[in-house]
């Protein structure tokens, strides 16, 4: 019955655009009722299409607002943009209509349009410019389009150059977009503003100072911010000051010092949960699974951060090849940012242990329960099929998902990757090229196409140019650093590739980057260093297929000798520029 209703609604949506021009349109209620039925039946595309049809010639502001909200909630920004355009036409003074138009434009990477709408919001909102910037800061912090958010913030600062609130937004956006040097400039400028809101708000001022210190560390200037934070602890030994110091040590990847400070902090009753959480995260990141288990078990006893504790204990059980225990632990993760990853990992366990129907049922439930993350969930489902060797099924899932969410960038990337897995390199490159046409200034799209060209030794000159543009926009992004190193390797510049790959690996020690760095070290004659990198990454990402294949391929070849006149091991410099990789761990709050 559900399938039949879905087909009927789909036919209604299709027919809405196929009527003869002389036919009377259905009443508005037809569209809104069928849209609400589609929502109840978890058919987001149909719901958004029906509401967009209802809004096309509508003057009822409440209906237009509902249509825009449904399109946005259903992850249909192209439809949301059309509805918002109609809404602003009907009510040109509506701040809400402008905001809806801005958010849709940002999702479509139409940055100039987004900036234009946001400028109208900021200038006309009855809440005031600073309040709107504060709301925008929160919105962008939860937006996955980090490069678009950064470019939007840059444009808004151009329009509001004397606004501390605008500079705050820019600082946080550039930091999330892996350009810490630019973030330093923004935070410094914000703090240099004449007496304003931050002077009357101690917590906001403290946050700006801490963010500036973190940005400086990530940009390669670690010593002074760390010394200042240490002095603050010595001068005023409060738990809050010590936590700030810990977070900066973590940003600088000085884990041993951070662990020492956290051991002190965990004896404070109020701060013990956050200290135990961070202790567990650091031990987990370092591969000390027994120590991490003890920390997270202690965290459970505090009855704080329970979802985090269960999630990481599940990952540890997973690493120990104890799937039944892992599944029980993942099932305890009830909410928060790790809830969906826990259940997705559970689907992988079920799929790989002969319970594919249960995995599919869990995926269906997840899509219904978390509609705002449906593309991510469906991509994970396809990945399970790739790992199981069922590429046709994976591609079918992704292509069907793309018809439901045609604006999803993540699905486009996943389709390109699946085509590549099938050996359809031309199809993969076409998909990425089309995406870049839609988002020509998106560093992620530039990097994806550039890397794929380089990985298959296609048009290396263009590959380098694309990656170079992405690198200029996000010089501390691990994926882009990896691509830069890999295209240099493909061009034969092996020694020049090493520092980029080292910087990438320092920021993200995943298997793919380890495979690339290890191969470069191997080709340079440093087989022992390559083996060390592979072993280190294998402990955390042992199922990585590229890592396994690279190790096997190179071990079957004769090891090259280290170049004459060079030291026994390569340079340990962490980056091609004097910058420290971004912080790997989240900065929690005390709860």
Q: Locations of the language-model features?
A:
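TPR alpha-solenoid repeat register
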Residues: 63-64, 97, 131-132, 166, ...
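Structural marker of alpha-solenoid helical repeat scaffolds
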Residues: 23, 57, 90, 124-125, ...
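N-terminal leader/linker segments that initiate helical-solenoid repeat arrays
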Residues: 15-69, 73-78, 82-85, 89-94, ...
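Canonical tetratricopeptide repeat
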Residues: 66-67, 100, 134-135, 169, ...
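Residue-level recognition of tetratricopeptide repeat
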Residues: 36, 69, 103, 137-138, ...
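Register position in tetratricopeptide repeats
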Residues: 40, 73, 107, 141-142, ...
